[in-house]
Regions:
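Long, low-complexity, Ser/Thr/Gly/Pro-rich intrinsically disordered segments that act as flexible linkers
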Residues: 1-45, 71, 132-138, 170-179, ...
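N-terminal regions immediately upstream of nucleotidyltransferase
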Residues: 1-99, 105-124, 146-153, 194
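Surface-exposed beta-strand-to-loop junctions
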Residues: 5-20, 99-111, 203-209, 234, ...
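Amphipathic alpha-helical interface elements that mediate macromolecular binding in regulatory proteins
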Residues: 27, 31-34, 38, 99-102, ...
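Catalytic cores of NTP-dependent nucleotidyl/adenyl transfer enzymes across multiple folds
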Residues: 28-37, 41, 46, 50, ...
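Short amphipathic alpha-helical segments embedded in low-complexity Lys/Glu-rich regions
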Residues: 50-70, 77-89, 122, 141-154, ...
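Pol beta-like nucleotidyltransferase catalytic core
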Residues: 245-249, 253-364
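Ubiquitin system architectures
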Residues: 351-532
Length: 532
């Protein structure tokens, strides 16, 4: 049965029966990959090169190169790096009939990120020659194909009983050393990475073990949701847009994990259809997506945090690799096509028809600490989509300071950055807990526009604390229209004489509409303005 025809109640069973790989195939794949790993560790290399360890994990996906050093090695600007952009056998999210894995080998001949960059071609050629010997020892049919990532990997296809798995062999620098627990490594590992000015995700294979742990910790049902999203990506999205530069599967994996954490509160007992529906709905909000974790690196670290904050100021969607602080996923890809297909599926896919998605925002809430000049402090948790004016309204509720008398600033290194009312926190890259400084000011004059029934516009200088009646008197003084004949509207609301302009949230450069109350006749109606 195709996914399109699966009912909501049958979705869990369909995923288990259709997408989970067979037990026999999984066991055979593990055995075969283990044989390849054993060969690489015990037979392949001469005594001067040691294999520290091998890791079976997920497939790689190309990303563009921009590093001039790498271009100098003969790689084109579109050459791909093997980066952690899929999910599969090593993480427990493999699909039935067709899946993928990386065999990452950590070699003693790479003593730094730079050496990995420089020595890769020679090592790959050596492994390719030696790997031919392994083919006769395997119970699987093995074919060695041209590498999907030229100059970065060896590509194998293992087949048995109609099921196959693609394997990439990836020689890598052992940046982490012995990984014994699921915790953050020494921050110096990431500082050294930043020092080599790598392209996004260039050395992501160095952090394979952390990427694997991040996904493998997920409960079984979440892994089935990951399988479902991957199936949608491979069998529905990609055939719809063959050849399109779509974002990598790994980005959708991370979005799915984020969705579960936020929408199901990391609970193992969740509704599969609701989770799937929520992921598709979030894909439609890709322009607002900003996702990151601080499991293995921290924004609090001076050097790493500064780099991460630069990434968080980039255009959305922003999805950061939880194990590699240089890995920003899916930039420049066709998220619009993903959103279009997600919307089509939400409207017509039987398993999510009528399903209510979880209440998940495309970016995590942030906690702001607002500091007054007298030492007062206020903590507010809001969405990054909150505008500065809305934030000022929240501050006003707590401290009683009118929004028009508040000036908020960020305090990055150097000159303070004044935050403007009409912009959102997200527009300033505030996707993380931040401290803002509040200065109380006297209401400043601002220019507003008054447009009459003839579409003629005049500019007036007012203060937010001016009343509507005071504005009417200014109109009377300039245009000769009696106050009692004026009817003013703003944002589809009639303005009452005793209220202030700030009460109606009148901003600089706002347009207020002027209508005339005619004696003994009908009142003219300005387009877009309500009747009294």
């Amino acid at each position: 049965m195709e996914l399109w025809n699966v009912s909501t109640s049958d979705l869990d069973g369909w995923v288990a029966a259709t997408l989970q790989p067979s037990t026999d195939f999984s066991a055979a794949v593990k055995k075969t990959v283990r044989q390849i790993c054993d060969f690489l560790k015990e037979t392949c290399f001469e005594d001067e090169i040691r294999v520290f360890k091998t890791v079976k994990v997920r497939a790689a996906t190309p990303i563009p190169l921009q590093d001039p050093v790498l271009q100098g090695l003969g790689l084109s600007a579109r050459s791909p790096f093997p980066s952690p952009q899929g999910g599969s056998a090593g993480k427990g999210t493999a699909l039935r009939n067709n899946s993928d894995a990386d065999v990452v080998i950590f070699l003693s001949c790479f003593s730094s990120y730079v050496e990995q960059r420089e020595e890769h071609p020679k090592i790959l050629k050596f492994i390719e020659n030696r790997l031919q010997e392994c083919r006769q020892r395997l119970s699987f049919t093995v074919s060695i194909s041209p590498p999907r990532y030229k100059g970065r990997s060896l590509s194998l296809t293992l087949s048995s009983n109609g099921e196959s798995i693609e394997v990439d062999v990836l020689p890598t620098y052992d940046a982490l050393g012995q990984v014994t627990q699921d915790g953050p490594p020494d921050p110096q590992v990431y500082v050294d990475l930043l020092d080599v000015n790598s392209s996004p995700g260039e050395f992501s294979t160095c952090f394979t073990e952390l990427q694997k742990k991040f996904v493998k910790r997920c409960p079984a049902k979440l892994k089935n949701l990951l399988r479902l999203v991957k199936h949608w990506y491979k069998q529905i999205l990609k055939p719809q847009y063959p050849g399109a530069e779509l974002p990598p599967k790994y980005a959708l994996e991370l979005l799915t994990i984020y969705t579960w954490e936020q929408g199901a509160n990391s609970n193992e007992a969740f509704n599969m259809a609701e989770g799937f529906c929520t992921v598709l709905k979030l894909l439609g909000q890709y322009r607002d997506i900003c996702i990151y974790w601080e499991r293995y690196y921290s924004l609090q670290h001076h050097r790493i945090g500064a780099h991460l904050k630069q990434l968080l100021r980039m255009p959305c969607p922003i999805i950061l690799d939880p194990a590699d602080p240089t890995g920003i996923l899916g930039q420049g890809k066709r998220w619009d096509l993903v959103a279009k297909e997600a919307a089509r599926c939400c409207a017509s896919m039987r398993c999510i028809t009528g399903v209510q998605p979880w209440n998940v925002q495309p970016a995590k809430p942030v906690t702001l600490e607002v500091r007054g000049l007298q030492g007062d402090r206020l903590r507010i948790t809001v969405s990054p989509s909150t505008t500065i004016w809305q934030l000022k309204e929240e501050i006003s509720k707590n401290w009683g300071i009118p929004p028009c008398q508040q000036r908020l600033s960020q305090q990055p290194a150097g000159t303070p950055l004044i935050l403007h009312n009409d912009k959102s926190l997200a527009s300033y890259g505030i996707y993380y807990d931040t401290t803002l400084v509040l200065l109380r000011t006297e209401p400043q004059e601002m220019e507003i526009f008054v447009k009459d029934i003839k579409n003629q516009t005049m500019t007036y200088s007012v203060r937010p604390t001016d009343t509507v009646l005071q504005l009417k008197k200014k109109i009377n003084s300039r245009q000769g229209i009696p106050v009692e004949q004026q009817r003013l509207t703003y944002d589809s609301r009639n303005l009452e004489d005793q209220r202030t302009l700030q009460h109606y949230n009148v901003q600089p450069k706002s347009t207020i509409y002027l209508l005339l109350r005619l004696r003994g006749g009908a009142r003219p109606q300005h387009p877009g303005c309500p009747s009294s």
